[in-house]
Amino acid sequence: MTLWFVFALMTVAAIFAVLWPLGRSARAQNQGSEVVVYKDQLTEIERDLASGLIAAPEAEAARVEISRRLLAAAGSEPVSEPKSSLKWRRAAAVLALVGLPLVAIGVYMPLGSPRLQDFPLAQRERGSGSGMAGSLENLVVQVEQHLEKNPTDGRGWNVLAPVLERLGRFDDAVRAYRNSITYNGESPERRSDLGEAISAAAGGVVTAEAKTEFERAHALNADDPKANYFLGLAAEQDGRKDDAATIWRALLAKAPADAPWRPLVQSSLVRVGGGTMPALSDETIAASKDMSEGDRGAMVRGMVERLATRLKQNSDDVEGWLRLVRAYLVMGDRDKAVGASSDARQAVAKDTERLRQLNEGLKTLGLDG
């Protein structure tokens, strides 16, 4: 109710501001005209002459000039409008002041919906999101229409392919990646992207066709992360978990510390059991063959202790924590394994993604509590 009252006051104020000049007489507006100015100047000349500030000839010349201007200005002044015209204008102003709001209300009531509730913000945001998705699909249609007319536009295929893959149109994405390679030339990234799209179309399985593309990407760039990851995944799916672990370990060894795909590779390595114990050098393995069982156990415990010490300095190493927990379990020391898992969770508690990977790894080790 208060809001409608404020709107009404604002409407009245706006109408009043527009119509106020219609109710004023022309005489009031003429008070500041040139005639009044010249009359004041004549009076001032008489005052200066009487006080002796100017001589009589100068006063006479000024009086003649100002009188001439006064007559000219008086002849150009508009004639005051009759009172009847002023009354009509005032009546029109009052009629507009009262009539316009009534007309607005009369039009709004049958057409408007004053009781309609506000459109909730959540629904507006959902509507906006669906609108954006629809807009993206419209853009895809436009690009596809352009490529139908210009099929050799390599840049168009290069732009379209990842968008199609993101929309879940994997078969179309495969075709777009192939055309991108045809018209842009091959590169490690394009071969890897094509292999990924083929795998996605197969439900995540690295098929022989997809593996061929990853091998081509690897031949162009042996350090291509996507090619190496999927080649490791192909080895895992073929049952060659040791080969998968070897590929992924090599990938992590060369990976930057802030690589966005590093957590994915680490969790995959844990999945295939690649983080059981710290890696042994060839010399250590050869020396261990001549050790007694007790000496060999002491060597393993020393390696585990060094790993635990290293994790105190580099506490965000999820793969290292999982190796340590698994090592304790292999040694039959479940209490230390539980303690290490607790320390690990505390170390990565502020990193949501690392904590998720850690919990998944611990769950595979039977320590999901």
UniProtKB/Swiss-Prot annotation:
Topology term for the membrane: Multi-pass membrane protein
Domain of life (superkingdom) = Bacteria
Gene3D superfamilies in the cross-refs: Tetratricopeptide repeat domain
Q: Determine if Membrane is one of this entry's keywords.
A: yes
Ranges facing Periplasmic side: 112-369
- Output one GO BP term: cytochrome complex assembly
Q: Enumerate the subcellular locations listed in this protein's record, separating them with semicolons.
A: Cell inner membrane
Q: Which residues cross the membrane?
A: 7-23, 91-111
Ordered alphabetically, the record's keywords are: Cell inner membrane, Cell membrane, Cytochrome c-type biogenesis, Membrane, Transmembrane, Transmembrane helix
**GO CC annotations?**
plasma membrane
> Has UniProt tagged this entry with the keyword Cell inner membrane?
yes
InterPro entries attached here?
Answer: C-type_cytochrome_biogenesis (IPR051263), Cyt_c_biogenesis_CcmI (IPR017560), TPR-like_helical_dom_sf (IPR011990), TPR_rpt (IPR019734)
State what this protein does. Answer: Required for the biogenesis of c-type cytochromes. Possible subunit of a heme lyase.
Task: Give the protein's recorded name.
Answer: Cytochrome c-type biogenesis protein CycH
Organism whose genome encodes this protein? Bradyrhizobium diazoefficiens (strain JCM 10833 / BCRC 13528 / IAM 13628 / NBRC 14792 / USDA 110)
Encoding gene per record: cycH
